[in-house]
Swiss-Prot record:
Pfam short name (any one): Ribosomal_L18p
Any GO molecular function: 5S rRNA binding
SUPFAM superfamilies tied to this protein: Translational machinery components (SSF53137)
GO cellular component term, pick one: cytosolic large ribosomal subunit
CDD domains hit by this protein: Ribosomal_L18_L5e (cd00432)
Residue ranges that the Swiss-Prot or TrEMBL entry lists as coiled coil: none
Full protein name: Large ribosomal subunit protein uL18
Subunit record text: Part of the 50S ribosomal subunit; part of the 5S rRNA/L5/L18/L25 subcomplex. Contacts the 5S and 23S rRNAs.
Length: 120
């Protein structure tokens, strides 16, 4: 039986393999969640560059949030990354949830990014 770490890595690889097959040159919105914060970045895999990023560790968000580990914080990060993506000229992305299930904070970030103008 695989360890928890191996199972997470296998699930993340499975998701990323699927993303690469459907990307068609679109950048990906990669999301990482820790116990205290949430991070999002839009990555152009063709050029190997990060086009936009946002996290709950940023000073302008930290002051307005009670904690970085709830759905309100995730929604704020989603709106901010969508705003920065539109400034960078990105409107279509592929959502990369990694090994995280589409629920809770991950879902809140994705829905806020959609409301902010990103399509995926």
């Amino acid at each position: 039986m695989a360890s928890r770490k191996e199972a997470l890595a296998r699930r993340a690889n499975r998701v990323r393999r699927h993303i690469k097959s459907v990307a068609n040159g679109r950048p990906r919105l990669s999301v990482h969640r820790s116990s205290k914060n949430i991070y999002a970045q839009i990555i152009d895999d063709v050029a190997g560059k990060t086009l936009a990023s946002a996290s709950t560790l940023e000073k302008d968000l930290r002051g307005s949030l009670k904690t970085g580990a709830d759905t309100a914080a995730a929604a704020a990060v989603g709106k901010l990354v969508a705003e920065r993506a539109s400034k960078a000229g990105v409107s279509e992305v592929v959502f990369d949830r990694g090994a995280f299930i589409y629920h809770g904070r991950i879902k809140a970030l994705a829905e806020a990014a959609r409301e902010g103008g990103l399509t995926f």
